[in-house]
């Protein structure tokens, strides 16, 4: 049986330890590990009681009594998912030494900070509506006169990383920088329109806002109108943005990624990396490349068009039921679901690319047995992008490793099935199917079902 939660009073060494750690993470709900429980104190406790329907109690009867509540450690993921799903940042503070061997107070440290844009686990992703879609963390920067914005989008759950620059479309009115900072968004809607459309298109779960943008009333007004969760964050690294990206991707130039000539985009991308490294407290080894946010390849559909056509979201209840995506989505894998959503929102413009995609679809439409066999194999393939992301960041578990093993075991059979298709698009897919035999052998030897 688990021990009941114990709570330090304000004068105890444990409460002073909590106060020291809380001071380092003032904008989070601090889940403080005490034995078999996570406990929350003071204002954190009041918030948790309201949001999680817990019981508030106090330690002590005098004016220094400490309000607190707790949740069992083994059920922590469920409660954390609820808090993150409601937009809170949660710091996980663990006991980092065995209490049996501790000399005095057990050492505790924050091992991870969770927020809507930094989550990896399936239950957390479901809580923010990203089970079948991307979960982007956005980082925004701007040059001195707000004529160009840098936008970076990083999905830590898949490793996808995009960055680009957006013209501010500012009218040449002779405004000083101070006037620009103070002007509301409504004074010059053109200045923000392109940025607004990109934020609506990607719908990030969280937006990082550095100091120079936090001072701009029009920019803050824009984010508030979009009801986006914002996090104040400034780069804490010593490397300048370009060098930080070069270090991350282990390259001597960003030219191969298309970003060499976009310094504002580089700044936004570096900001996103800084934030994730500070919250995950570890390396981001699965983030191995970055792509340029290019719009020339797709038909540009503004938010009003996407909404009125009900491409991915119903006007009635906001779900996918009755939408084009809801009609088309028969995908069997997480990666397939994300890709289909992107295709629906980004229709191709180039005739040759459209025809290559149609050729591949026609192959499956014309061969019932091939289609059936391929779908049956895809059922055995997990969300490899997210499985690998959790493993690399140290957040994976035994179920993830079993799912990864099963997925890798299926790839040779999938490749053999697809070899009967002549379409160029499928040949390209086959070229990227890598069963990773050494990794598979390690998993098979290490896992006992």
Residue ranges and their predicted role:
Residues 366-371:
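Conserved interaction-surface patches within small, structured recognition/assembly domains
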Residues 2-363, 379, 383-392, 396-449:
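Charged catalytic and DNA/RNA-contacting regions of genome-maintenance
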Residues 375:
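Aromatic-lined, polymer-binding surfaces characteristic
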């Amino acid at each position: 049986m688990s021990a009941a939660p114990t709570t330090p009073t304000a004068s105890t060494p444990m409460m002073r330890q909590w106060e020291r750690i809380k001071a380092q993470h003032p904008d989070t709900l601090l889940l403080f590990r005490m034995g078999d429980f996570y406990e929350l104190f003071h204002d954190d406790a009041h918030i948790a009681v309201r949001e999680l329907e817990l019981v508030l109690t106090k330690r002590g009867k005098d004016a220094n009594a400490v309000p607190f509540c707790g949740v069992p450690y083994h059920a922590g993921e469920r409660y954390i998912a609820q808090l993150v799903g409601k937009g809170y940042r949660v710091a996980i503070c663990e006991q980092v030494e065995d209490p049996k061997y501790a000399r005095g107070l057990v050492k505790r440290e924050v091992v991870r900070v969770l927020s809507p844009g930094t989550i990896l686990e399936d239950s957390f992703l479901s809580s923010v509506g990203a089970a079948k879609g991307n979960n982007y963390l956005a980082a925004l920067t701007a040059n001195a006169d707000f004529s160009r914005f840098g936008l970076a989008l990083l999905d830590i759950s898949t490793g996808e990383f995009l960055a680009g620059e957006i013209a501010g479309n500012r009218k040449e009115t002779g405004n000083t920088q101070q006037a620009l900072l103070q002007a509301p968004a409504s004074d010059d809607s053109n200045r923000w329109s392109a940025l607004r459309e990109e934020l609506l298109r990607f719908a990030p779960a969280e937006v990082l806002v550095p100091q120079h943008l936090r001072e701009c009333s029009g920019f803050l007004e824009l984010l508030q109108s979009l009801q986006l969760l914002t996090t104040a964050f400034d780069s804490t690294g010593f490397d300048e943005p370009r060098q930080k990206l070069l270090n991350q991707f282990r390259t001597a130039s960003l030219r191969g990624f298309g970003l060499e000539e976009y310094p504002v985009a580089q700044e936004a991308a570096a900001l996103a990396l800084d934030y994730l490294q500070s919250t995950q407290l570890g390396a981001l080894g699965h983030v191995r490349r970055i792509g340029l946010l290019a719009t020339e390849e797709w038909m540009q559909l503004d938010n009003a068009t996407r909404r009125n056509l009900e491409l991915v979201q119903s006007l009635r209840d906001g779900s996918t039921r009755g939408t084009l995506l809801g009609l088309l989505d028969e995908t069997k894998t997480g990666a397939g679901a994300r890709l289909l959503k992107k295709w629906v929102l980004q229709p191709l413009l180039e005739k040759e690319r459209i025809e290559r995609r149609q050729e591949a679809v026609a192959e499956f439409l014309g061969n019932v047995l091939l289609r059936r066999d391929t779908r049956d194999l895809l059922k055995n393939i997990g969300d490899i992008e997210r499985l690998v992301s959790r493993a690399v960041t140290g957040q994976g578990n035994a179920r993830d490793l079993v799912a990864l093993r099963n997925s890798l075991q299926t790839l040779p059979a999938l490749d053999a099935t697809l070899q009967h298709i002549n379409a160029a698009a499928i040949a390209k897919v086959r070229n990227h199917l890598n069963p990773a035999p050494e990794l598979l052998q390690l998993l098979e030897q290490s896992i006992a079902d």
